[in-house]
């Protein structure tokens, strides 16, 4: 990962485009220029909150999401050189949050509705996080020993440490 100095230097490369194509390339439409602007201003808590408004698993996505084929490939800087390394910036903020205390995103008042989700892989975890934010009570059912699905059982430790998955799941 980046040091703080490297992260700010990389974030400073972002052109803050009026019509950011990087956001269009992101499957969950993370407001990329917005979180990068927070990073430049050293507002790390705000930056991770921006990411979490759309992405429940930033530490995972910052490590294994194929940014070079999605958001980064659409960065205009890539036309003349290297695009902004969005994934490493997302990872930096997620790791910063882990080291400084997790923030629980705001959630709506309880609705009284209870939702069961079968499968605690990435899709199930994301659905659970979105439903909890909307005020619903969620119960996850998982056939295997640990939640995380492919994140735990399909991605090798050197690529995605299990501790990272555990932290994301437990928040």
Annotate the PLM regions.
Residues 116-118:
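Conserved beta-strand elements of the Class I
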Residues 29-41, 49-52, 79, 83-87, ...:
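Beta1-alpha1 glycine-rich phosphate/pyrophosphate-binding loop at the start
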Residues 1-114, 162:
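Ferredoxin-type iron-sulfur electron-transfer modules and their immediate structural context
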